[in-house]
UniProtKB/Swiss-Prot annotation:
Main location as per UniProt: cytoplasm
Compartments it resides in: Cytoplasm
Residues that coordinate or bind ATP: 231
Protein's name according to its UniProt entry: Tyrosine--tRNA ligase
Keywords: Aminoacyl-tRNA synthetase, ATP-binding, Cytoplasm, Ligase, Nucleotide-binding, Protein biosynthesis, RNA-binding
Gene it is expressed from: tyrS
Signal peptide stretch: none
Residues spanned by motif 'HIGH' region: 39-48
Length: 418
């Protein structure tokens, strides 16, 4: 199947500059293409993952992806999709983020992959202001720039000259990569359409209207309930394991709505059409088994964090479901309960009622006794119904933690003071 046909059935294409021309080109030869990311932070989140999954598909089809880290454009700020001006980062911060994102990309694509990393600071930093204005600014029509959504949406609230010129810098990126590496396709999110077409216009003005360059954007990802994909009550789901643990990452995918899961399987996994159709049938016939969600969680967690992290996430999930918390290792306890409320307790044995009230897990001694008597309190996975029980924090988890649950879902991680 042609790569464009595959992306079409996956629903992964939003807009194309020349659909027939690009399909013909990719059918006739292997091409070089690129997608960029600005180092506005030191990690990508799952929203960033979508275009780079597309890049991986091109690689698997034999094409040559280039990943552009915007060391220069990241110091300016992309106005796309924003209502307000970005805060400028220090160059030290930008360089720190460039290194972090480069490492993240290398983990995603693998060290032996046919993917090339580039940094636009290498060429944009060498262009003087006069050269920029003479060589590129002269070719860009202000009226055209003002008409693009990325600028037009900001005219009422205001946009700085710095951010206004961003699309010219991204256009120079496309031109430079086309000249130096024969890159013919740029991929980006739906909000990058204006920047991508600006680059194509610049190339056509310099090299001729028949120059074969293309642009393709991915759809804006919304959940079935209309809310933005990738956000939770706790914030963004990051690709960095230090920001979002593999267990939390795995659980995010496991908890997806039946209405969304098949679309996500198409976007975020490399499963074929037949297998995805089988999982779609399972969602219809046996939704309670959540087979599609399990497969989605497995595939994406393995791709982002690797096999070992996936197995650990599955192990933690299995233990928490069974309630046998004492089988968790210290590291797994920290990973499983990193987002639950934390409390501090002394290392000496303490009466259960006093411990629950002193840590504010229970609002009063009366409520604590009532919950204990009713079996609503578990300590390290064991139900405690004795209000006179003495709890020894040193008994489990090497004396470092105590896991307390009130009711069915309210977990607390008690950290034992040294």
């Amino acid at each position: 199947m042609n790569i464009i046909d595959e992306l079409t059935w996956r629903g992964a294409i939003n807009q194309q500059t020349d659909a027939e021309g690009l399909k013909k080109l990719t059918s006739e030869k292997k091409i070089s293409l690129y997608c960029g990311v600005d180092p506005t932070g030191d990690s990508m989140h799952i929203g960033h993952l979508i275009p780079f999954m597309m890049m991986k598909r091109f690689e698997l089809a034999g094409h040559h992806p280039y990943i552009l880290i915007g060391g220069a454009t990241g110091s300016i700020g992309d106005p796309s999709g924003r209502k307000t001006e970005r805060q400028l980062q220090t160059m030290d911060k930008v360089q720190h983020n460039v290194k972090a994102l480069s490492r993240q990309m290398q983990r995603l694509f693998g060290g032996d992959s046919n993917v090339t990393m580039v940094n636009n600071y290498d060429w944009l930093s060498k262009i003087s202001l006069l050269d920029f204005l003479r060589d590129y600014g002269k070719l860009v029509n202000i009226n055209t720039m003002l008409a693009k959504d990325i600028v037009a949406s900001r005219l009422d609230t205001g946009i700085s000259f710095t951010e206004f010129t961003y699309q010219i810098l991204q256009s120079v990126d496309f031109l430079t990569l086309h000249n130096d590496h024969n890159i013919q396709l740029q991929i980006g999110g739906a909000d990058q359409w204006g920047n991508i077409t600006a680059g194509i216009d610049l190339i056509h003005k310099i090299k001729g209207a028949d120059e074969a360059v293309y642009g393709l954007t991915i759809p804006l990802m919304l959940k079935a309930d209309g809310t933005k994909f990738g956000k939770t009550a706790g914030g963004a789901i990051w690709l960095d394991a230090d920001k979002t643990s593999p267990y939390e990452f795995y659980q995010f995918w496991l908890n997806q709505d039946d209405r969304d899961v098949i679309r996500y399987l198409k976007f975020f996994t490399f499963l074929g059409q037949d297998e995805i159709n089988q999982l779609a049938a399972a969602v219809e016939d046996e939704p309670e088994k959540r087979l599609a969600q399990r497969r989605l969680a497995e595939e994406v967690t393995r791709f982002v964090h690797g096999e070992e992290a996936l197995e650990s996430a599955q192990h933690i999930s299995e233990i928490l479901f069974s309630g046998d918390i004492q089988r968790l290792t210290l590291t797994e306890v920290q990973e499983a309960f990193e987002k639950v409320p934390n409390v501090s307790i002394n290392s000496e044995p303490t009466n259960i009622v006093e411990l629950l009230t002193e840590t504010a897990i229970e609002p009063s001694r009366r409520q604590a006794r009532e919950d204990i008597t009713n079996g609503a309190i578990t300590i390290n996975g064991e139900r405690c119904t004795d209000t006179d029980a003495q709890l020894n924090p040193k008994t489990n988890f090497s004396g470092k933690f105590m896991v307390i649950r009130r009711g069915k879902k309210n977990y607390f991680l008690a950290k034992v003071k040294d």
